[in-house]
């Protein structure tokens, strides 16, 4: 059996540490010089200095343990095993998606986990796909109760209970609470952009457009992320991704045109559900690029939970000030189905979906997981049609198809660009 070895250098006292991405990430391995490794996922350099007294050590991943084989001075070989102290992937839940940062372990070297070899059981596929199912169907559930409860109440209810559940889960797991002004300031700003603005714009948009169409527009946010990452982090866009950006703009225009033409002279930008959804997508995109900053100061799961709680409070206040129907006596008019829909959007559409995505991201390939994002608008469209009789016009169908192709091109693997 072949092991996924990565060569590393370690001192005999085992006191030095180096963070390794993969065998292909090492720029140089020379004695008396710097050993530089690139974490290809976060595009950062880690350096350590070694001298000729250091021994060559090989490492393999064995489940949750790290097995190291070293050659001693008398040329004998010894093998030790140590447990991994933390997950190799950190994820932050944002908007209706999750942003994950690989902390260094090569995805392809994960011999155990969900669909690691491209095959999997029915249960594994169900777990892998379930977050996208929950996010898509939560859009339908939200739209169903919006007229009865009000948009801002639904947005707040989706965030606050789910956030408290995630915080409780993080405490149960022994995750550290945010500490210091930097941690809380970053979470608060992240909450304002990714929770308050995103969910508020989303709820406003759902009042004026279909769940399926809105979900397609929301999922166009990788187009904006690609542009922001290029300007802020110097990440290369490339020919294929640039083509995807142009195609994405064309697709979004095709999605918006039917709304403009149908309203004629009465068209108002702020009365357009597609426009509100586009604003929500931009909020989510900005939240995506903020993840790296937030994760520097806080545990990812804690940050996810607290940003949902903090971001939901302004929405609740706006709901009260705006006299949403739920505060004007309509609460007693809620049917059992309405209550179930509200609970579903919060528990399954937020807390459970984020938790399952976290689990899948740490057990399987992030590339495979991110390639399934197109399922969210697909589920939203299918269940919007089944339960709300929503349909796409011919032009909107073309626009949705063009937009989804553009999203795929923007997420195109860099090595193939």
UniProtKB/Swiss-Prot annotation:
Localization, UniProt: Plastid, Chloroplast membrane
Chief place of localization: plastid
Top-level taxonomic group: Eukaryota
Gene Ontology cellular component annotations, sorted alphabetically: chloroplast; chloroplast membrane
Annotated keywords: Chloroplast, Membrane, Plastid, Repeat, Transit peptide, Transmembrane, Transmembrane helix
Recorded topology in the membrane: Multi-pass membrane protein
Chain segment of the transit peptide: 1-68
Regions of compositional bias (Low complexity) in chain numbering: 68-89
Region described as Disordered: spans on this chain: 67-92
Location of the EamA domain: 133-255, 283-411
TM helices/strands, residue ranges: 122-142, 152-172, 183-203, 213-233, 237-257, 269-289, 301-321, 339-359, 369-389, 392-412
SUPFAM superfamilies membership: Multidrug resistance efflux transporter EmrE
Coiled-coil ranges (or none): none
Family of the protein in this entry: Belongs to the drug/metabolite transporter (DMT) superfamily. Plant drug/metabolite exporter (P-DME) (TC 2.A.7.4) family.
Entry protein name: WAT1-related protein At3g02690, chloroplastic
Source organism: Arabidopsis thaliana
Source taxonomy: Eukaryota, Viridiplantae, Streptophyta, Embryophyta, Tracheophyta
């Amino acid at each position: 059996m072949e092991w996924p070895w990565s060569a590393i250098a370690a001192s005999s006292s085992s006191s030095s540490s180096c963070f390794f991405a993969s065998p292909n990430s090492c720029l140089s391995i020379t004695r008396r010089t710097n050993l530089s490794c690139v974490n290809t996922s976060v595009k950062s350099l880690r350096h350590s200095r070694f001298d000729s007294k250091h021994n060559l050590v090989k490492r393999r991943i064995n489940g949750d343990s790290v097995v190291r084989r070293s050659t001693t001075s008398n040329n004998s070989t010894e093998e030790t095993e140590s447990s991994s102290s933390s997950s190799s992937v950190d994820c932050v839940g944002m908007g209706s998606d999750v942003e994950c940062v690989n902390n260094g372990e090569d995805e392809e070297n994960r011999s155990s986990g969900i669909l690691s070899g491209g095959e999997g059981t029915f249960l594994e596929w169900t777990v892998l796909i379930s977050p996208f199912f929950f996010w898509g169907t939560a859009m339908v559930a939200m739209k169903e109760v919006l007229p009865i409860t009000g948009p801002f109440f639904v947005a707040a209810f989706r965030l606050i209970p789910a956030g408290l559940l995630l915080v409780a889960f993080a405490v149960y797991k022994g995750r550290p609470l945010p500490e210091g002004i930097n941690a809380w300031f970053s979470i608060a700003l992240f909450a304002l952009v990714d929770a308050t603005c995103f969910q508020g714009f989303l709820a406003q948009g759902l009042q004026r457009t279909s769940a399926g169409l809105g979900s397609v527009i929301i999922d166009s946010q990788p187009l904006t992320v690609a542009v922001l990452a290029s300007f802020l982090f110097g990440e290369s866009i490339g020919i294929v991704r640039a083509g995807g950006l142009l195609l994405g703009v064309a697709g979004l225009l095709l999605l918006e045109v039917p709304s403009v033409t149908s309203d004629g002279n009465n068209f108002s930008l702020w009365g357009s559900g597609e426009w509100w959804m586009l604003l929500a997508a931009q909020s989510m995109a900005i939240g995506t690029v903020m993840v790296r900053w937030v994760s520097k100061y806080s545990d990812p799961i804690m940050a996810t939970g607290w940003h949902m709680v903090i971001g939901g409070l302004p929405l609740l206040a706006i709901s009260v000030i705006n006299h949403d129907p739920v505060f004007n006596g309509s609460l007693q008019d809620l049917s059992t189905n309405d209550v179930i829909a509200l609970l579903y959007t919060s528990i399954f559409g937020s807390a459970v979906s984020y938790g399952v995505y976290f689990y899948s991201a740490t057990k399987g390939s992030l590339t495979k997981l991110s390639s399934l994002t197109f399922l969210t608008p697909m589920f939203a469209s299918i269940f919007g049609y089944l339960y709300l009789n929503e349909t796409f016009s011919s032009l909107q169908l073309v626009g949705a198809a063009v937009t989804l192709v553009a999203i795929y091109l923007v997420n195109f693997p860099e090595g193939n660009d």
